[in-house]
Swiss-Prot record:
It comes from Gallus gallus. Its main location: cytoplasm. Disulfide bonds: none annotated. This is GTP cyclohydrolase 1. The lineage of its organism: Eukaryota, Metazoa, Chordata, Craniata, Vertebrata. GTP shows a positive allosteric effect, and tetrahydrobiopterin inhibits the enzyme activity. Zinc is required for catalytic activity. Inhibited by Mg(2+).
Length: 236
């Protein structure tokens, strides 16, 4: 069972066209789960915030255990609230980082004008509806416009946005917009294929279901041949 919702086997997300030189860059809209101020936005959470909020977060897990009918004082659960609290802070550590942190020294002038693709980037995130994981692969391609990005930084972009409370559709779009804002390329394509534990462990309980989403910007959206080349290469 696949939850793909589109042509070419992938769900297409509507998004703004790729910016051209001299035009205003697109921004991640407020309330979209991003920084609210594009790829240079402020961190919504700091290390100090983590330290200050850890006791209340652990106390919340203690309350959850009691509400489930468990005894937080029994041996196996004595440290569970603190373990769960620190784990949740790690699962959402993307709130402590911005794209500017990793991209400022990794954008290089380069005349390469053919497609750049990094595929099968491992992704782990938390569904914001049920707070259970969804995991999968991210495939990214872009057509440079005089600038390229260090390849490992594409994986870092995925890490920053996936380590937050997310929905897959928004995550796909945020990755594409971040690359577009940073490089102003001729186009960007992002495809995510993921398994959602909220569909596996609860609800319809379909073990083999996968959801595929995509965001195509610039020539990847406007030119069917460019889009098809990208989709063919990530499938190969």
């Amino acid at each position: 069972m696949a939850a793909a919702r589109s042509c070419n086997g992938y769900a297409r997300r509507e998004g703004p066209p790729s910016p051209k030189l001299g035009t205003e860059k697109p921004r991640v809209s407020a309330g979209s789960g991003g920084s609210g101020d594009g790829w240079r936005g402020e961190r919504p959470r700091s290390e100090e915030d983590n330290e200050l909020s850890l006791p209340s977060l652990a106390a919340a897990y203690t309350t959850i255990l009691r509400a489930l009918g468990e005894d937080p004082e029994r041996q196996g659960l004595l440290k569970t609230p603190w373990r769960a609290a620190t784990a949740m802070q790690f699962f959402t550590k993307g709130y402590q980082e911005t794209i500017a942190d990793v991209l400022n020294d990794a954008i290089f002038d380069e005349d390469h004008d053919e497609m750049v693709i990094v595929k099968n980037i491992d992704m782990f995130s938390l569904c914001e509806h049920h707070l259970v994981p969804f995991v999968g692969k991210v495939h990214i391609g872009y057509l440079p416009n005089k600038q390229v990005l260090g390849l490992s930084k594409l994986a870092r972009i995925v890490e920053i946005y996936s380590r937050r409370l997310q929905v897959q559709e928004r995550l796909t779009k945020q990755i594409a917009i971040a690359i577009t804002e940073a490089l102003q390329p001729a186009g960007v394509g992002v495809v995510i294929e993921a398994t959602h534990m909220c569909m596996v462990m609860r609800g319809v309980q379909k073990m083999n279901s996968k959801t595929a989403t995509s965001t195509m910007l610039g020539v990847f959206r406007e030119d069917p041949k460019t889009r098809e080349e990208f989709l063919t290469l990530i499938r190969s």
